[in-house]
Amino acid sequence: MSVVKITVGGAMEDEAARQFVDAWHRAERGDSFHERHLAFESWDALARVLTGKRMELLRYVRRHNVASVRALAKALERDYSNVHADVQALAAAGLLDTARGGVHADYNAIETKIAI
């Protein structure tokens, strides 16, 4: 399963170092793994990116082959400009891929670690 791991606030540097060492050891063993690590400075920063509508959009993209932002807006029955803005924000955060044509979410889960 491909996973996006999100770290929020606190000890992001320590977590990034731990993730690097863990990935290094897995690569040395020849383990195959597919995960992406993202970091947000605060809960507010994460909440600005992962709104309810954007989570709905991510779930739809994960389950369907989406040829274009226009097709996605039509499928979600939402205004094109709002969907376009959401796709741009999610792509900028590293949660969507639009480079290969269409709109893709190449992961099955998002795991979040929030420092308090």
Question: Model-found features: residue ranges?
Answer:
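General nucleic-acid-binding
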Residues: 1-27
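Short alpha-helical segments that sit at the start of domains
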Residues: 28-56
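Short amphipathic alpha-helical interface segments
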Residues: 52-66
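A short acidic, leucine-rich amphipathic alpha-helix
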Residues: 69-76
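Basic amphipathic alpha-helical segments that dock to polyanions
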Residues: 72, 83, 87-91
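Glycine-centered, phosphate/nucleic-acid-interacting loop/turn motifs that mediate DNA/RNA or nucleotide
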Residues: 94
